[in-house]
Amino acid sequence: MALTPMMVEYMKTKEEYSDCILFYRLGDFYEMFFDDAITVSRELELVLTGKNCGLEERAPMCGIPHHAAAAYIPRLVNKGYKVAICEQLEDPKEAKGIVKRGVVKIITPGTFIDANSSLENDNTYLMTIYESDERIGLAVSDISTGEFKTTSFDNIKITLLDEISKVAPKEILVDKNISQSLIDDIKGITTALITEKDFNEFIVSKEEIIDQFSDLEVSGLVNEREISSRVLLKYIYETQKMSLTNINLLEQYEIINYMTIDGNSRRNLELTESIREKSKKGSLLWVLDKSATSMGGRTIRKWIEEPLIIKSEIEKRLSGVSEAFSSISFNEDLRSSLKDIYDIERIVGKISNKNVNAKDMLSLKASLDKLPSIKELLGTANSELLKEYYENLDELSDIRELLESSIKEEPSLSIKEGNIIKDGYNSEVDELRQSKLHGKEWIAALENREREFTGIKSLKVGYNKVFGYYIEISKSNYNSIPEGRYVRKQTLANAERYITEELKIMEDKILGAEEKLINLEYSLFTDIRDSIEKEIARLKKSARIISNLDGISTLALIALENDYVKPEINEDGIIEIVDGRHPVVEKVIGRGEFVSNNTTLNQSDKELLLITGPNMAGKSTYMRQVALITLMAQIGSFVPASSANISICDKIFTRIGASDDLAGGKSTFMVEMWEVSNILKNATSKSLVLLDEVGRGTSTYDGLSIAWSVIEYITGNENLRCKTLFATHYHELVKLEGVLPGVKNYSVAVKKMKDSVIFLRKIVEGGADESYGIEVAKLAGLPDDVINRAKEILLGLEGENNFDIHKVTNTEIIENEVAVDINQANNVVTITEKACESKSEYIEKVEAKDSFDKAKSNKDDHRIDEKTENSSKKHKNKDSSNNMQLDFTFIEKEAFLKEVSEVDILSLNPMEAMNTLYRLVAEAKKLK
């Protein structure tokens, strides 16, 4: 058996678009067949049916009404599918044989804009990555706004991953020859759809990219930028099936002109979404984005993603914000006009894509109506930036007048249904409307006349697209119908429909005029659209100014509402913040509840602030606060503080919080070390680094050693010495102040009250004396038995009391089983035996363990001091359960002596010898 002719055509089309779900137009439905039908049925929960395709088995099939496609396509695209729309290219009534069909558009995650989406303030970016031996080229576009930009940089993987994290593309094009390891790394940081193409073949010509932009713009491209841009343009042509006139400016940018923030730091600082909810609420963007327009919202987001590092540019933006902040009436008038402006960028995108309707045109007109008042307002401005906006803002009065004269105030939604052109714009339209109106009046007169003639009051004249105009009479009035007056056309359950020759003649006149009118209005609308399309460059320029102006106005409004101050900007390596506040936490808990803190970082005595103190006390909040204030200053925003003097930072790095990568086979500690390694390799003397609890994912000695070494590396490396906030629970590190250059101790103030503590959340000079971990556990609601036992264990571990390892609570005793974990320089020894009844038996049990034998060379090394032995005997007499009392300090002392004896002084350089001596002295003091 062979496939039917229609199915043969379907299979040809499907083969060409094999990576897409094919929406195949059949009448009023889009149909999917075979695997596509199964996929769509599953993903959209549609009924799966079958269709005779000419084979023995029916082809799996599912379908959706064509008018409902807009509701279904986003769901597929958001799941990572591509959708190819195959339309009927001719009227089925006029077709000879199989109806001609063709794919008119491919909708992908990187090229789709959902008009009904709540994410209108977000960009939908499509990215191309081209990799040469030494360089990487990127091209990025949002086809809905017409943005198209490119950059290149040294072939360093982390730089590429950081840029992907910043741009957050929905779809990424890569060369099919790219390494799988790089693809895996990209997939590890983004959920974007990865599309592979052969860049040697999938690329537009040099002439095509020049036609899209200009010879001048293209001639300045280096090889990597040119190739990535040509590939990206090819993909846009392929998916849109046309050249988009709104993509008319090729912008080159340098990543070194913006602050570098890696993906991990963006996440930790919660710049655009919260860690917990993965939503805008709770992020810095949530605080700063009160934009009046969608364009302004995208601009605020872009500024947060790309802080400036050139002082003159920062101060220029700050000057605009400052003027809007200082003149409340100016900003209120400005925002009053801005709030009535629609998304001009995306309306222009619809014009370019031939997808604009009459209501979009009215939105454009309403937006342009506000430009004269905004221009007039800017004429009163004094700041350099606002003056530039005034000089460059095109009021677009010619376009506004065209729309004012041509588009009806309440047009049809579809441009193919008529009722879109305003009366008086075109004389032929006016004449046809009169003909149509007279025809409708004639129909109304006919209905009244027939009612009087027949005496049937319920008689009515109606219309539908199948039968045209008809006279409808209910069955109860059949006997009142004059014989021979009407011709029966249709029988219904409770009525009959009739026609007359006179009615059909008038129908032809009415419908003829209506059809002509609809076609004429459509033609006029496309002419208007094409006229405006020629002015896209002007529209985009004014839209860019409006979006930036909204960004400036919004930052001024936020500063006023939240009592922010204008920061001073310096390049001297000094960060001085007085009464700094965390912008997001303050917003959540309320200004009156938040405790402000001062911060001083410099390149002399306060290069690295070593912050100690308990959990829950506010260390992480404080550290993030400093980073966010710095970032806000560099986007040109006022900051939450009484005063701030911010040195420009080229990069912000954070290592905060615990996370693992189980899929990648990395533990929490491995991830932590990878992050620290990345920071130490890429930070510079102009960077701001936040390190929280480095080394906590391993044993105490290992963790302490790593944390210590990291601090030494940062402060001792002349090419690094970056401004650093270093929070730790290793209180031994406080002794580094005065020993290592630039280290300064700070802690979180705590107020003790009997058995409880109050965290004052105030950062003060000096190191913390306690961690208050048990108090935090108590605040968290742990049972009293657990808290009390923890205190007892703590006393034992600190050597202030004997430690009973058998006892779980003050009243319960473990049966005659004991598990003793002896930690010595990361070698863990576990003993699980019945309770030892004497010192000699305990030693024998220890000797039986191979791992412990390796750590201790002979039986003489296992000495239990007199205090422990006497205590054990005393406890044995008191308690028949034979519980063993151990003083764990003897293990630490023996380990310490062994470490001292094994130090090879001759193999150490002077710095290593000093460090070793300092560490051994510190450990010896603990064992007193």
From Swiss-Prot:
Q: Where is this region: Disordered?
A: 854-880
Q: Name one GO cellular component term.
A: cytosol
SUPFAM superfamilies membership: DNA repair protein MutS, domain I, DNA repair protein MutS, domain II, DNA repair protein MutS, domain III, P-loop containing nucleoside triphosphate hydrolases
Q: Which InterPro entries match?
A: DNA_mismatch_repair_MutS, DNA_mismatch_repair_MutS-lik_N, DNA_mismatch_repair_MutS/MSH, DNA_mismatch_repair_MutS_C, DNA_mismatch_repair_MutS_clamp, DNA_mismatch_repair_MutS_core, DNA_mismatch_repair_MutS_N, DNA_mismatch_repair_MutS_sf
Comp. bias intervals (Basic and acidic residues): 854-872
Question: Record's HAMAP family?
Answer: MutS
Protein name according to UniProt:
DNA mismatch repair protein MutS
Organism, scientific name: Clostridium beijerinckii (strain ATCC 51743 / NCIMB 8052) (Clostridium acetobutylicum)
The taxonomic lineage of its organism, from the top, reads:
Bacteria, Bacillati, Bacillota, Clostridia, Eubacteriales
The gene for this chain is mutS
